Amino acid sequence: SLRTQIHIYGDNFGTDPSKIHITIGGQYTTTIGCTNTEIYCIVPPKAFDGNIKIKIESADGKNSPIEYEFEKKFNYTLQPSVSTLVGSEDENGNSSDVDGNFEKARFGNPQWLLMDTFGIEKCLIINGQGGPIRRINLEAKEVSTLLTNGQGGFRNMQFMSFDATGDTLFVSDDHGSSSKDNREIAYILRSEEFRKAHPYVYDRTGYNNVYCALNKSLYYNTYWKGGLQKAVHDPTTGGKKGVELFGVYENSDSGTFMCIHPDGRFMYITGRNCILVSQYNKVTNEFQKPTTFAGREGEAGYSPSPGPSARFQEPYQGTFVKNEEYIKNPRPDGNIYDYYICDRGNHCIFKITPDGNVSLFAGRGSVSSDNKVSGNIDGELKTEARFDNPCGIAYDEETQTFYIADRENHSIRTISIE
């Protein structure tokens, strides 16, 4: 998306842009062009308000620079927008996993994102069904492969989660069997550069796992009734074994996606067109059988509405984000987080409040151009931007940036104030 332009009019500016230095709201901006009577620049990132200051050097460098500060303060409300960070397709819309800098890197089927702020450099960890696990270094602007499906001994690598320290990644495996003799969860270590898979628990096939810091336990799912499993100590082997806590569905077999609230108070369980909530019991230190929070099991559609009236197509990964309004005006339950979730089938990102009110956050824009809601368009969140099967989402609280794994666009998109 284009940045906002600023034109400054006056006299005796000169014609050398390199001699003109401008700050807007304390942020430096580049002088794009100038004539003797006009300066053209753009609003720099994070320039929300403040004074506009100009310093103009003399043409020969012999005289002192002229400095001027506008009396009227600059006040500009920046709007968040969708952009493409990295990833591209060929002329036929195809792509594959290619490592390299952000200009060269490509993605085959990006689906699951984890924000990695535990290491020296800020990164994203990404994978898709069948792997590989890759690192997106946001500081070096490079993409590298950590572990492939074959290198890790996976039948069909699925999705992953960090432990509380960020030193361990747990990775699920859809091995396609009801036998408990197969490795279901592997773990990989930062100390080994996440390049070697070790067995963590053997169980029936599954798709997703999540670590709970409150009781230092790993939870994962299975296909059968979407059963929630817990990895517990096995005194016989000295390792871990799976214990089923409950079936998520009464009459259906299907996988789920899970996300635990930052303070551990509950877990959202997503699948079959709805989002369920499992409360954490602090007396038993265990999650309880879930109830429906938003949407209705087995009823697909598109409807940003309150609670059970909402309709999802294929809700996928979600992430919790602090809402400053809840901090200024505390809720009775003390919850300060909204939930943002990708809906793969509806090609959008939904926002869900703690009360279950579902609203469109981003995507499904530019509809008047071709009456489609999927596509690859950057721009304003709801009127312009489009996604194509967005699956993964992560949030960087420091920069207030969302990262989206846009599967069929084979790219990583961002939602931020540029």
Regions found by a protein language model. Give the residues of each.
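Short loop/turn segments immediately following beta-strands, especially the blade-tip
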Residues: Y187-E193, A231-G238, V277-N285, I415-E418
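Residue-level detector of Asp-centered blade-edge/turn motifs that repeat once per structural unit
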Residues: M115-I120, F162-G166, C212-N215, I260-G264, ...
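Gly/Pro-rich loop segments of beta-rich domains
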Residues: I8, T77-N109, A140-Q158, D174-G176, ...
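Ser/Thr/Pro-rich low-complexity tracts
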Residues: S1-S83, T236, K282-N285
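Blade-level signature of beta-propeller repeat domains, shared across WD40, Kelch, NHL, RCC1
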Residues: N389-E418
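Residue position within the beta-strands of beta-propeller blades
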Residues: I125-N127, F170-S172, Y220-N221, Y268-I269, ...
